[in-house]
Amino acid sequence: MKKKKRFKQKLLIASLVIGLMAVLSGCGYSTDPITSESTGFWSHYIVFPLSWTITWFSDLFGGSYAVGIIVVTILIRLLIMPLMIKQLKSQKAMTNLQPKIKELQEKYSSKDNETKQKLQQETMRLYQENSVNPMMGCLPLLIQMPILLGFYQAISRTAEIKTDSFLWMQLGNPDPYYILPVVAALTTFLSSKISMMGQTQQNKSMAMIVYIMPVMILFMGITLPSALALYWIIGNIFTVFQTLLINNPFKNKREQEALAAAQVAEDRLKKKAANMKASKKGGKKRK
């Protein structure tokens, strides 16, 4: 059961990684300049609105397209914040359910198919009773994939954005000094690590993504426009503050440690009581 579960989780992570790489490769998309006359659902309803919004905010802030990208990134994060809050609550609920899940696993520890099926049913019932969706953690990433590709195309297909300069780099070109890709990778790691804090070891079976994503971001940031690295950095910083404010991981970690200590103390008391009861029975038999 555990091996099968781990395999499914690894398969899911691999699918997400491959999907992200495929999305960012942009295979087969149009390279024509984006305008209000652009045809096709993707170009007309996704890429052009992003390009127009970045341009509008850039004009509002003195013609800096980098500032426009930063503002639009924050707006997108605010729009998907309800979903992120739901994800954080789901993660916390999953963490709180781990002791009960462990009890079920001990109760249905047999390896026969009937017991495995019963364990699966009881686990799903527990999730439903507590309104927990184990797959909720993947949904924000899936939603951000098309947004990321839309950003990429808006930058690549808007000459004004592509040729605009920010600090030492051109937004449409990779950072020549690799500073932004490194910062993007580090903030990705920090964001993921903080999100995983306070979770139980069982929940951390997905923790490999904490190390996979920064490496991917680093390599993609080296080859893709620096504007995307800027998008990642701002988004990651926003996520860090959002996590700290909504679902304080340091507080959660202390709570989990306190619960674990209380559980250990309770187990010791039960064991001590059982030993005393057994010794009393043994004394009566000798009499």
Curated annotation (Swiss-Prot):
Residues 1-26 form the signal peptide. InterPro entries: YidC/ALB3/OXA1/COX18, YidC/Oxa/ALB_C, YidC/YidC1/YidC2_Firmicutes, YidC_ALB_C. The keyword Flavoprotein does not apply. Keywords: Cell membrane, Chaperone, Lipoprotein, Membrane, Palmitate, Protein transport, Signal, Transmembrane, Transmembrane helix, Transport. One of its GO terms (biological process) is protein insertion into membrane. It is found in: Cell membrane. A lipid is attached at C27 (S-diacylglycerol cysteine). GO terms for cellular component: plasma membrane. A lipid is attached at C27 (N-palmitoyl cysteine). The chain crosses the membrane at residues 65-85, 135-155, 178-198, 207-224, 228-250. The keyword DNA-binding does not apply. GO terms for molecular function: membrane insertase activity. It is a multi-pass membrane protein. Belongs to the OXA1/ALB3/YidC family. Type 2 subfamily. Required for the insertion and/or proper folding and/or complex formation of integral membrane proteins into the membrane. Involved in integration of membrane proteins that insert both dependently and independently of the Sec translocase complex, as well as at least some lipoproteins. This is Membrane protein insertase YidC 2. It comes from Listeria monocytogenes serovar 1/2a (strain ATCC BAA-679 / EGD-e).
